[in-house]
Swiss-Prot record:
It comes from Desulfurococcus amylolyticus (strain DSM 18924 / JCM 16383 / VKM B-2413 / 1221n). It comes from the Archaea. It catalyses: 3'-dephospho-CoA + GTP = GDP + CoA + H(+). This is GTP-dependent dephospho-CoA kinase. HAMAP family: Dephospho_CoA_kinase_GTP_dep (MF_00590). Pathway: Cofactor biosynthesis; coenzyme A biosynthesis. One of its GO terms (biological process) is coenzyme A biosynthetic process. Keywords: Coenzyme A biosynthesis, GTP-binding, Kinase, Nucleotide-binding, Transferase. The lineage of its organism: Archaea, Thermoproteota, Thermoprotei, Desulfurococcales, Desulfurococcaceae. Its EC number is 2.7.1.237. GTP binds at residues 40, 59, 61, 107, 128. Catalyzes the GTP-dependent phosphorylation of the 3'-hydroxyl group of dephosphocoenzyme A to form coenzyme A (CoA). It is an enzyme of class 2 (transferase).
Length: 157
């Protein structure tokens, strides 16, 4: 069934700037996985599994391919189309006590509402490079947020 999802969409010209690590980049000496870092929340399936965090935001995908990272619990389920931040995702960032947020769609940009609303230190994967720990200033997050464009995305759910 098709559903209209209100979102803030990432313009194409923003994609390059946000693909650059937005914090401290950690790379393992052998270019393998990085383990054991601490942050308030992790965005991404592999990162969520390998680091110590209070909250996990996952979508059962890595590099756009479905992955099985073991049994997962979902305190909150959100719908978030690729390249967007849905209003549903913003609402989920306000929920206290949630330890696991499962995303139908893509979780990549959800770093933004969780750092803005909760001031979280976030850890996320930098594909084929390493792991980034980010705790940007509120001003930096608001600047990124202002660049997103309101839109409606039709998603088959």
């Amino acid at each position: 069934m098709n559903k209209a999802i209100p979102v803030l969409k990432l313009p194409v010209d923003f994609r390059l700037s946000l693909s650059i690590p937005q914090g401290d980049l950690y790379v393992s000496p052998d270019r393998g996985l990085v383990y054991g870092l601490r942050a308030d929340a992790a965005v991404g399936d592999i990162v969520s599994k390998n680091h110590m965090v209070e909250m996990r935001i996952t979508d059962a995908k890595t590099k756009r391919h479905t992955v099985d990272v073991g049994p997962g619990e979902c305190d909150v389920l959100v719908v978030n189309p690729q390249g967007t931040i849905s209003i549903n995702s913003f609402t989920s960032s306000l929920i206290g006590g949630a330890r696991s947020i499962c995303v139908v769609g893509e979780e990549d940009l959800l770093v933004i509402p969780f750092t803005l609303v909760r001031g979280f230190k976030i850890i996320y994967g930098q594909p084929d490079v390493g792991v980034v720990i980010s705790s940007p200033s509120r001003e930096r997050v608001l600047k990124i947020l202002k660049g997103l464009k309101p839109d409606i995305v039709i998603m088959n759910l």
